[in-house]
Amino acid sequence: MSINIAAGEKLAVVGAINPATIANTEIFSTVVDMSKWHQLLGVAMLGNMAAETIDFKAYSCNSDGSSSVALKSCTQLAANAATNDNTQLVISVRAEDLSASGKQYVRFGLVTGGATGGPAAVLALGVDAHYQPASDNDLASVQQIKL
């Protein structure tokens, strides 16, 4: 690992759920091709949430997001608005985690147990790209990288 490579070249924004109200219909991130990465880090950022359960999961899937199967999940957050407000959930996925499913794509899902929900977003970062710089694989929606 070289300390001379900027973090913006070592990590890439490869998936997202843009800030929105998340409620009882699961919202999914952009699909990530794990053939380009050794690891993937999904970060859910919760805002002022209602007193409802919250589930954050990583799914193996096809390139179009179909045939999703739960791969990893955070422990369900209990329905407690004060405890869940302004918190983060993190899931780390390694390429080898997909071997049992035979899939090469991953997406993240976020859902609450009720209709009110609250504001949230998900950011998926590609880590340890097979080919550098990792930033070559950023989503098209990434407007700027300042190194």
Where are these predicted regions, by residue range?
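Surface-exposed, low-hydrophobicity beta-strand/loop segments enriched in small/polar/acidic residues
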Residues: 2-147
